[in-house]
Amino acid sequence: MTPALREATAKGISFSSLPSTMESDKMLYMESPRTVDEKLKGDTFSQMLGFPTPEPTLNTNFVNLKHFGSPQSSKHYQTVFLMRSNSTLNKHNENYKQKKLGEPSCNKLKNILYNGSNIQLSKICLSHSEEFIKKEPLSDTTSQCMKDVQIILDSNITKDTNVDKVQLQNCKWYQENALLDKVTDAEIKKGLLHCTQKKIVPGHSNVPVSSSAAEKEEEVHARLLHCVSKQKILLSQARRTQKHLQMLLAKHVVKHYGQQMKLSMKHQLPKMKTFHEPTTILGNSLPKCTEIKPEVNTLTAENKLWDDAKNGFARCTAAEIQRFAFSATGLLSHVEEGLDSDATDSSSDDDLDEYTLRKNVAVNCSTEWKWLVDRARVGSRWTWLQAQISDLECKIQQLTDIHRQIRASKGIVVLEECQLPKDILKKQMQFADQAASLNILGNPQVPQECQDPVPEQDFEMSPSSPTLLLRNIEKQSAQLTEIINSLIAPLNLSPTSSPLSSKSCSHKCLANGIYRSASENLDELSSSSSWLLNQKHSKKKRKDRTRLKSSSLTFMSTSARTRPLQSFHKRKLYRLSPTFYWTPQTLPSKETAFLNTTQMPCLQSASTWSSYEHNSESYLLREHVSELDSSFHSVLSLPSDVPLHFHFETLLKKTEIKGNLAENKFVDEYIISPSPVHSTLNQWRNGYSPICKPQIRSESSAQLLQGRKKRHLSETALGERTKLEESDFQHTESGSHSNFTAVSNVNVLSRIQNSSRNTARRRLRSESSYDIDNIVIPMSLVAPAKLEKLQYKEILTPSWRMVVLQPLDEYNLGKEEIEDLSDEVFSLRHKKYEEREQARWSLWEQSKWHRRNSRAYSKNVEGQDLLLKEYPNNFSSSQQCAAASPPGLPSENQDLCAYGLPSLNQSQETKSLWWERRAFPLKGEDMAALLCQDEKKDQVERSSTAFHGEIFGTSVPENGHHPKKQSDGMEEYKTFGLGLTNVKKNR
């Protein structure tokens, strides 16, 4: 067992990550893994991994490992962690230099053994080579050659010195001391020979050299090469040993912390049980000091460890566990960096030696935690789906069983025999009578009473027999009775009277929701079928003897729809238990209740208490979202599936706004800050302490709030409330100073406005009858509407009446009226309409001529002016008469008009020529009559009078005649005025 587990917990320490002599305040009580790593990066070996500081008298070189693994007391024992060999070996180098200052040139050989990390081994040189060097003083040439060898080795080593330094800073220890592997024997020998040729030959060319001296130099060179190769081998062995030691120590650390966590988990299990069972208290009478001995078996050791851990973990707190976790994280990361190359940076730049910070992220915010939560959500939803599928399969199986039972319990529908025609029935009755008579003749012992009805049957079978009619009526009534009885359930099969239904309902109810079992159904079916058979036999016995079965009936086949129903077994009504009624929305089970703990992101808070408050509303929130959005399922959908606009709506509807600013509520035109107790409680829930700052509400928010108030209060209530607030505000400002801060004003206003708002609301509720929340409809207004008789019940239905249809007259059918299509009849029929058309066209031609002839128009205007100057009175009177005068005037008026104005005469002549060219269905006589207006003066006057009555809507005198002409001059003026008036109207 490791020495770290042997210490006695005399003081009841919770976690024993390292021996008791360690500096616990430096390692276990650090706040973060970064602090542990910074302590681990110290230059001295005493601060590495939180181990105890060695005594100053001890030699700390790594070759002297007498203290490693030796059994010592729990307070003073040495453990060497060679995670960083440079600091340890540098200290050994300094101590060794102080001890070996008097040694001559052996230090030069030892200086050759420096690597990129300044690692120096002590006493690795062979004893005989060291003695030889001490006995035989080296010559200048040899010493110079050794210096050159050192320079060569140093030049080969220092090529990657910077790389090694950066790698050591980044904790890549696997590359330390790796440069000497590249220096082969051939390279060393080549360098020595080159040094000898360079230094000896040019420098001592003029000096005679003896053969003995040359041999000594060669021997020294050979021994030097041998020593260098030996030291290289030893260095490689030392590196392998160091790597192996690091792996062993890493396993030791991992095993140690694994045991600590295992004991912690064992301790937490009974602690959780005691939390649910407060009666069982962990006993404190256990011994506080236990020691695990190596010679005891493993089971006993584990039991003792468990007993010791129970006493130690009994007083554990969350802070101690957190400190233990931090220290373990730091040590394990340090070990990982030393052994795993992937955990370190591969860059050799000196500027990139920054330490990668490991943030102290909360457990519920880490990526691994989120992945586990998502995995649990998907797994729980999959489990819920599997449960629903299995439930549906169970229900389908139950319904299948019910359907099978219903089909098995169905009775047979028995139909009566087909009704035969009367003639066939008479023949069958005759055959039956003959057979009966034969039977009577064959059996003379039959009593005479049986022979009496035979002659009576012949009389009764006659069509006029009343007995046959009565029998038919009885047959029909019997058939109707059978049909009614078959439709009504028998009395002994009703659930109230049957012996099967007298049993308790608990015996009939099964787990699948069926009230009647299969065996009971079969028994009941057999009993009911036997009852039906008995009834059938009794009914057959009561049937009339005249209905006899014969073989001829089997050959008759009729449709089942035409045959009456004889017997019918009423179907049973099966009811399922209420738990099996299908609902459109299945409620989740208790096992899936943990799904509702996750809220929408907009509703999540920073602390556990706030999230616990929202847990009760989670299910209602999911149900609400599923009702609004059909694509969202209350159980299967994830919280991330909630649409974005629902999040925004939730944020807008929230009364509390969480953020860096204080939570403020708006009342009317002022900001009301929450009370100190409420704000501190919200700060504790949200996990932060916001700084209160004065806020000013914008005009838009004021309008929005005012609009919301108008929805709940009437205009009168709003006016009273505004007046009350203004008076309170004036009262507050009168008693306050001008140098008050914004926050103090807000606090003062908040208290006043709260009280005033409550009182105003109570007063308005008591006084105002238009409060939307307290509208009461009296029953006197509702009761008459309920008792009122509906109108559609009084609608009268129209009745039918008899209509006498009279035939058409026969004399009118044969006669047909023949229309006369001769020209004379046609002209007489259309003469009046043609005259009206002529008058219309004359007026149209006159107005058309005035529009086209601008000269005539200008002359007419000039003439009008002259007439107005000469005859103002006459012209005015002519204008008054123009409305009543006909538009189509005779040729006399045209001649009178031409007397003063020849242009008008020309226009009239042109007009007459146009009328001659028109193609009317008129004869030559009619055309001559139209040109001669003197002969048909009366017809023209009548037509013009009728035309005026239709077009201009003028009133005609009662006598039906126009006013008489007074003079020819006046007629001329009237005609001229009529033409000017028409021209003005057309303009």
From Swiss-Prot:
InterPro entries: NSL1 (IPR026180), PEHE_dom (IPR029332). Coiled coil: none annotated. Keywords: Acetylation, Isopeptide bond, Phosphoprotein, Ubl conjugation. The keyword Metal-binding does not apply. There is a cross-link at residue 134 (Glycyl lysine isopeptide (Lys-Gly) (interchain with G-Cter in SUMO2)). GO terms for cellular component: intracellular membrane-bounded organelle; NSL complex. The keyword ATP-binding does not apply. Residues 794-915 form the PEHE domain. Acetylated on lysine residues by KAT8 upon ionizing radiation-induced DNA damage; deacetylated by HDAC3. One of its GO terms (molecular function) is histone acetyltransferase binding. Residues 708-738, 949-972 are annotated as: Disordered. The modification Phosphoserine is found at residue 462. This is KAT8 regulatory NSL complex subunit 1-like protein.
